[in-house]
UniProtKB/Swiss-Prot annotation:
Comp. bias regions, Basic residues: 100-121, 147-156
Modified-residue entries (Phosphothreonine), positions: T128
Family, per entry: Belongs to the eIF-3 subunit D family.
UniProt GO BP: cap-dependent translational initiation; formation of cytoplasmic translation initiation complex; regulation of translational initiation
Keywords on record: Cytoplasm, Initiation factor, Phosphoprotein, Protein biosynthesis, RNA-binding
Protein known as: Eukaryotic translation initiation factor 3 subunit D-1
Organism placement in taxonomy: Eukaryota, Metazoa, Ecdysozoa, Arthropoda, Hexapoda
PANTHER family: EUKARYOTIC TRANSLATION INITIATION FACTOR 3 SUBUNIT 7, EUKARYOTIC TRANSLATION INITIATION FACTOR 3 SUBUNIT D
Subunit comment: Component of the eukaryotic translation initiation factor 3 (eIF-3) complex. The eIF-3 complex interacts with pix.
Domain notes: The RNA gate region regulates mRNA cap recognition to prevent promiscuous mRNA-binding before assembly of eif3d into the full eukaryotic translation initiation factor 3 (eIF-3) complex.
Entry's localization field: Cytoplasm
Length: 560
């Protein structure tokens, strides 16, 4: 068998390509039609072409190398995307939460604290076996849902801050002179201020009934409504200060006004004080028909009372209730009656005439002066609420105040009926947190008056929903200077704040000024206001000057 070889088979031929010669440069002379109008983009062979998508891992571990897949040349802008707002494509979407079926509820609940989306006991997840866990108390403290711990750090937002209203509306014709922020006021100090010297003493005091020291939660006593007149006369309306201003001092005020200024760094609510400069004399006044004399409730609390005027637990209604309780308590704990002994000062009550037959509250007035340096002499009217007879026969003057419990659940406080007898310190500490400004002002008033004791009463509602009936659950007494140290109240700083404001006003021209605490910022502002501002007889354009505040009561003669 033989094989036949076909020699006529054709082999593939090689055609020599045509090489174009470019005399003017390099590269081809003509561009093929398939590559016309195609933009050129520089590239590098080392550039990564893409990234593998991992749909199971939601965490990003490439934060340090976010440009890992970018071009090395930084070019190619012709392919970049630029966002332009297109209103034609705008449409609303339904944001309502879709109810999950029962089998999917709580499916990923245990994956919050695990890294990279793994479970607690999965591979690479968080293993809780053999680990020390936090106690329930610590978990509550660290949980952002409870308002503490690291809630704000991780974006957990709380309720929006409440915008408080100003105590007086700032008008266009008022000129702002100075702004004093609290951090700067806290650093002020005026040490070595001696005790005030008595100039005039007026009024009559009743003796304290020691049986109220034995009151406790199990032996409570109802709070009585005592019909007595309490005078809260401002500085320029005081006849004694008018008389003393001709011979003694160059700065005049009352203890309530001084305490408000000295404790201004602890206040949250807005307040204002009118100052008149006449020559080298300065008079500090409160405006008529304002809420200056009302006692605030839970002013410094983390959750202050809600602004609902229809509720008995609104800030204004609670302030009226606290003032009512304070006035009645300070008179009930005294020995009243015509046969009971009384302590009389040198002069009678300056706010009542001899022919008036009215029952006045037990109040003793001390007009004292202080040397503040730089020829500044302060004259102020201070008050005592009662007197205590000591075994040695010497009288001890008292400042009597009352703390009130309205609703411990709404106030986020301590229930007095459970803790007052056994843990009184915890109750007082809670009150110091919620009413820091009010307690500080009471302490300053007691120190200015030279009281030997500061008597605090604990008064609570019989029913949390009834704000008209109250009971006395206990009393507690302190020495004013020791209590000031206990609540971290520096009298040197208080005098420094007062001296700073006095020096600022002394540099101004004669006229009327107003100090106001900003309702929402820790700032005190000094305004230059027209001389006829807040005058009751000013009725230009039929528009009263007292538009900025709401008339509450005439506290010049207020019955309780």
């Amino acid at each position: 068998m033989s094989e036949t070889i076909n020699t006529a088979a054709q082999f593939p031929s090689f055609e020599k390509p045509t090489v174009q010669f470019n005399e003017k440069g390099w590269g081809p002379c003509e561009l093929p039609d398939t590559f016309k109008d195609v933009p050129y983009q520089p590239f590098s062979k080392n550039d990564r072409l893409g990234k593998i998508c991992d749909w199971t891992n939601t965490s990003s571990n490439d934060k340090k190398y976010q440009n890992k897949y970018a071009s090395s040349f930084g070019t190619g802008n012709q392919y970049s995307y630029y966002h332009e707002e297109d209103e034609t494509t705008f449409h609303l979407v339904d944001t309502a939460r879709v109810q999950k079926p029962p089998h999917q509820r709580g499916r990923f609940r245990n994956m919050r604290n695990s890294r990279s989306g793994r479970g607690r006991n999965a591979r690479g997840g968080l293993n809780t076996h053999g680990m020390t866990t936090l106690s329930g108390k610590n978990v509550k403290a660290r949980d952002p849902r409870h308002g503490r711990g690291m809630g704000k750090k991780f974006g957990h937002r709380g309720p929006p801050p409440k915008m408080r209203e100003s105590s007086v509306a700032v008008r266009a014709d008022w000129a702002s002179i100075e702004e004093m922020d609290f951090p700067r006021l806290i650093k002020l100090s005026l040490p070595n201020i001696k005790e005030g010297v008595d100039i005039v003493t007026c009024g009559t005091l009743e003796y304290y009934d020691k049986t109220y020291d034995r009151i406790n939660v199990k032996n409570e006593k109802p709070l009585q409504k005592i019909d007595r007149i309490v005078h809260t006369v401002t500085t320029t309306d005081d006849p004694v200060i008018r008389r003393l201003s001709k011979t003694v001092g160059n700065v005049f005020a009352t203890d309530a006004i001084l305490a408000t200024i000295m404790c201004s760094t602890r206040s949250n609510y807005s307040w204002d004080i009118v100052i008149e400069k006449v020559g080298d004399k300065v008079f500090m006044d409160k405006r008529d028909h304002t809420e200056f004399d009302l006692l605030t409730v839970n002013e410094s609390s983390v959750e202050p009372p809600t602004d609902d005027d229809s509720s008995c637990n609104s800030p204004r209604n609670l302030a009226i209730e606290a003032t009512f309780i304070n006035h009645n308590f300070s008179q009930q704990v005294l020995k009243t009656g015509d046969q009971e002994p009384k302590y009389k000062f040198e002069e009678s009550n300056p706010f009542i005439s001899e022919d008036e037959d009215i029952q006045v509250a037990s109040v003793g007035y001390r007009y004292k002066k202080w040397e503040l340096g730089s020829d500044i002499v302060l004259v102020a009217r201070c008050e005592h609420d009662g007197v205590l007879q000591t075994p040695s026969g010497e009288p001890q003057f008292m400042t009597i105040k009352a703390l009130n419990e309205w609703d411990s659940k709404l106030a986020n406080g301590v229930e007095w009926r459970q803790k007052l007898d056994t843990q009184r310190g915890a109750v007082l500490a809670n009150e110091l947190r919620n009413n820091a400004c009010k307690l500080a002002k009471w302490t300053v008033q007691a120190v200015l008056a030279g009281s030997d004791q500061l008597k605090l009463g604990y008064v609570s509602r019989i029913n949390p929903r009834d704000h008209s009936r109250h009971v006395i659950l206990g009393t507690q007494q302190f020495k004013p200077h020791e209590f000031a140290t206990q609540i971290n109240l520096s009298m040197d700083n208080a005098w420094g704040i007062l001296r700073c404001i006095i020096d600022l006003v002394m540099k101004q021209k004669d006229g009327k000024y107003l100090i106001m605490k900003d309702p929402n910022k820790p700032i005190i502002r000094l305004y230059d206001i027209p001389d006829n501002t807040f005058d009751s007889d000013d009725s230009d354009d039929g528009e009263g000057d007292d538009e900025g505040f709401q008339q509450v009561y005439n506290y010049a003669h207020n019955k309780i």
